[in-house]
Amino acid sequence: MDDRRRFHRLQTQMRAQYFLKEKKGGWEECTVIDVSRKGVGIKFHKPKNIPVGSVIHLEVFPPKELEPVVLNGVLKRIEQEGDDLIGGVELKEVLDGNKLARLG
C-alpha cells in the first residue's frame, strides 16, 4: 500500500486525555500510539460515537515530565480495533522539534 504521509510517524505508548469541542462532557482517557510533526494516532478506551471531523483537544503526558503537551486537531479517521477505537488526528500546527522530542 502506498503511504502518502508527509512526515514519518514514531510509534509510542503515552497516556493522554481528550476533550471533544462538539460534545458536552469532560475529559476522557486515551493513549497516543504514534506521533508525527502533523498528526497523532490515538487509541480511545471507551468507545463512543466520535464523528470524523470532530475538533479534538489533547493533553499528552510524556513519562517523567510534570507538564502535559497540549495539542489540537481534527479527527480524520476512526476504526474499530478489538474493544477499542483507533483514530487519526491531523494537528492544527506542525510540531516543532521540542514538542516532537517530548512526544517521541
Model-derived segments and spans:
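Short, conserved beta-turn/loop elements at beta-strand boundaries and strand-helix junctions
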Residues: K21-K23, R37-K38, I78-D83
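Short, acidic/hydrophobic/Gly-rich beta-strand patch recurrent on exposed beta strands
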Residues: T31-I33, G41-K43, G87-K92
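Short conserved beta-strand and strand-loop elements enriched in small hydrophobics
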Residues: R15-K21, G53-V69
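N-terminal helix initiation/capping motif
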Residues: M1-V35
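C-terminal output/interaction extensions
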Residues: K23-G25, G82-G104
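A residue-level detector for short acidic-glycine micro-motifs
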Residues: D34, L75-E79, E93
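Short alpha-helix capping/helix-loop boundary micro-motifs
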Residues: D2-R5, V40-K46
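Short beta-strand-centered aromatic/proline hotspots
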Residues: E28-T31, L71-K76
